[in-house]
Amino acid sequence: MNAVILIPARLDSSRLPRKMLADLEGEPLIVRTWRQALRSNLASRVVVAADSPEIAAVLEPLGAEVVLTSPTASCGTERIAEAARSIEADVFLNLQGDEPLISPENIDLALQPFFDAPAGSALPDCTTLVFPLGPDDRTQIDDPHVVKVVMDGEGNALYFSRSPIPYVRNSSPSLRLYRHVGLYAFTAEVLQRFAAMPVSMLEEAESLEQLRLLESGFRIRCVNTAVDNPGVNTPEDLELVRSLLRRASRA
């Protein structure tokens, strides 16, 4: 099984422009994400799929492999699919470029189901990670930047939403709430099929690319993780990550 990590990196984010180059205690954000990806035990290669030579300019002197992709990709998965066409692999993991604190263990958790599949059996279409939320975690439950997920009895995603799901009319001791941890692993075939499909209705409504797969009948297997690392979507997130890095450097 050959697994490759692809990191989509777009320079002009709408919520935090040029965040890939934002300074995080002496290193650009994208460099820190790339360094964390290199620590995976299961991936054989890490490639950054960038839309700007400026991103390549900070990575390539460090030895990073960078593929320049079209600036017109509608989402990160389309960007990595473009890069993947020139790379031989069985599985591709989409690690968002704005995850500078991503745990290497989380990367390997998403990849492990592909390695565990018995010889000759079907591989998962796609895997991702989920993190449990408590019923009192209202800040995250109500935050549209925090994506929530509900699953079937076998751990396959039923739906992802920026809204609180499920709607809790009657609480139950067995009710479990989860947030989505935004990395995905795909077979090479499913990744290219995703990129060939048009943007779906629910994907456009929620601005969540994974809904394109669900609407087309693919299964997304959700793997539980106990490690939740903050990504960077807003200026407030950026300051939080900076403070965490400063704290870690003093430890």
UniProtKB/Swiss-Prot annotation:
EC code: 2.7.7.38
Disulfide bond residue pairs: none
The molecular function terms of the Gene Ontology recorded here are: 3-deoxy-manno-octulosonate cytidylyltransferase activity
Q: Name one GO biological process term.
A: lipopolysaccharide biosynthetic process
Presence of the UniProt keyword Transferase in the record: yes
SUPFAM superfamilies linked to this entry: Nucleotide-diphospho-sugar transferases (SSF53448)
Keywords on this record? Cytoplasm, Lipopolysaccharide biosynthesis, Nucleotidyltransferase, Transferase
Any Gene Ontology CC annotation: cytosol
Q: Is Transferase given among the entry's keywords?
A: yes
The record ties this protein, via Gene3D superfamilies, to:
Spore Coat Polysaccharide Biosynthesis Protein SpsA, Chain A
**Compartments, as annotated in UniProt:** Cytoplasm
In terms of InterPro entries, this protein maps to: Cytidylyl_trans, KdsB, Nucleotide-diphossugar_trans
Record pathway: Nucleotide-sugar biosynthesis; CMP-3-deoxy-D-manno-octulosonate biosynthesis; CMP-3-deoxy-D-manno-octulosonate from 3-deoxy-D-manno-octulosonate and CTP: step 1/1; Bacterial outer membrane biogenesis; lipopolysaccharide biosynthesis
- Report the catalytic activity: 3-deoxy-alpha-D-manno-oct-2-ulosonate + CTP = CMP-3-deoxy-beta-D-manno-octulosonate + diphosphate
Top-level EC class as recorded in UniProt: transferase
What is known about what this protein does? Activates KDO (a required 8-carbon sugar) for incorporation into bacterial lipopolysaccharide in Gram-negative bacteria.
**Family per UniProt?**
Belongs to the KdsB family.
How is this protein named in the record?
3-deoxy-manno-octulosonate cytidylyltransferase
**Organism of provenance:** Chlorobium luteolum (strain DSM 273 / BCRC 81028 / 2530) (Pelodictyon luteolum)
